[in-house]
Amino acid sequence: MLDQNVVKQHCRIDTDFTGDDALLTLYTGAAAHYVQTWTRRTLYEKEDSPGYVDDPAPILLNDDVKAAMLLLIGHWYANRESVVVGQTVAEVPFAVEALLQPYRIYGV
């Protein structure tokens, strides 16, 4: 969904290094799932993606969504455990939610 080289650049990984490609692919899929779960909408790469036309509330992979996904991926890549010792605490999901807020569908 996101270009692997863009993900690597965001994570400050040399684009020629392939040792973490599977991990980055996993994080990219998890970030896309996070977007869909948080917004309660199906994420589509482009308008001609299968299902987009028939979806009553689709969300496109626009710059806001890409930035949110990159923030999540970068956070997960840098912090691979649930607790980080010796670091200042910063809530990355808040920045992600700020980017995704305009696209969220609130329940009935």
Would you name each region that the model predicts?
Residues 1-108:
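Divalent metal-cofactor coordination and adjacent catalytic microenvironments
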